């Protein structure tokens, strides 16, 4: 069997990918309506160089495609990028941003030149009432990481494909038998393990993926459930 070759990933890019996960959502309000800003990973066909309008923000330089439409949904006034850009206009625009967005990005202002550093991208979506804008955002890895850590983002939970399953034995206890004892066993025989992993109440421990899990069995609608927990106090049911 040949060795599995894995591509090398820059540690900073790995942090960004882990922080972004399946996507992050930020709720805000604008124009008296509830809205949502969402960042999503790029899909393979979207991996193109940064194109759009470069903006300087509180978290760093960002490049937005369809910036005019997207920024217009982040506050109470529409944004126009046509004509000569004046400082008073951007000051007014920042004052009318949603407070949540202003805390994250303000002050927002155009950058005269594109960022020359290596950038990474993600998809960005804004939904305000029945309006939606889908665009792309590019920034340096450091800036994107700062963006993801500078607000109360909520992780999007992507449902796991039911076709992907992992089978592992559930060990209830351990005991040693000689070959003669094993050969003498008959259906209906009762075995008492010398080392029990579970008690009569269904509580016990399970070793899975090199970690020790506290386990609790339960039944619901004639299905046996196994609840696992570990030191991070998260729970998983199977």
UniProtKB/Swiss-Prot annotation:
Residues 66-238 are annotated as: HrcQa-C. Its main location: membrane. GO terms for cellular component: plasma membrane. It is a peripheral membrane protein. Keywords: Cell inner membrane, Cell membrane, Membrane, Virulence. It is found in: Cell inner membrane. The keyword Membrane applies. Interacts with hrcQb. Component of the type III secretion system, which is required for effector protein delivery, parasitism, and pathogenicity. Probably participates in the formation of a C-ring-like assembly along with hrcQb. The HrcQa-C domain interacts with the hrcQb C-terminal domain. This is Type III secretion protein hrcQa.
